[in-house]
Amino acid sequence: MERDKLMTGLHNLVSVVGDRVATLQGFAELLRSTGSYRWVGLYDVDHAARIVKNIVWSGSGAPEYPTFPITMGLTGAAISSRETVNVGEVAADPRYLTAFGTTSSEIIVPVFDGTGENVVGTIDVESEKPNAFSEDVQSLLEACSNVIRPLWRR
C-alpha cells in the first residue's frame, strides 16, 4: 500500500471543513483504491443503543449488515477489546459474519473518542486475498484512525 499517497490524501480530505459523510466517503474510496481492497466501510458505534451502524462504504455492494448489535462479529470483538482485529483467514474464525462470499481476510480498526477511552467508530476493510493485512498495513490503518478521529466529535 502506498503509505505516503494514502496519508497525504487523507490529511487533505480531513483538512477541508465540510460534510462528515462526504469526507468519510472520500476516505473509504481512497483507502480501497490505494490498497486494492474489495470493500471498505466506516461505522458509528452507539453505546447507548448498543448498535453499530454503517455510515459509508466503498466497494462492490452495500453492507450485508448495515446495523447490528455491538457484540456481533469481528467488529464486536474490536469494540470490546478496544484493539484492532486482524483476521488472515475469515473462514477459520467463528466470529466472522459472512457478508461477501469472496472475502478471505478482514481487519477492523477502532476509532476512539477524544479521550482515547471509548470506541466511537470502526474502519472495516475486506480483501479477497488471504492474510492481506501485514503489521505495516495494520499500523497504517491505525494511524488513519487517529487522523479521522475528529470526525466523530459531536
Q: Where are these predicted regions, by residue range?
A:
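Juxtadomain coupling helices with adjacent low-complexity linkers
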Residues: 3-7, 11, 121, 127-154
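A short, aliphatic-rich beta-strand micro-motif
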Residues: 105-114
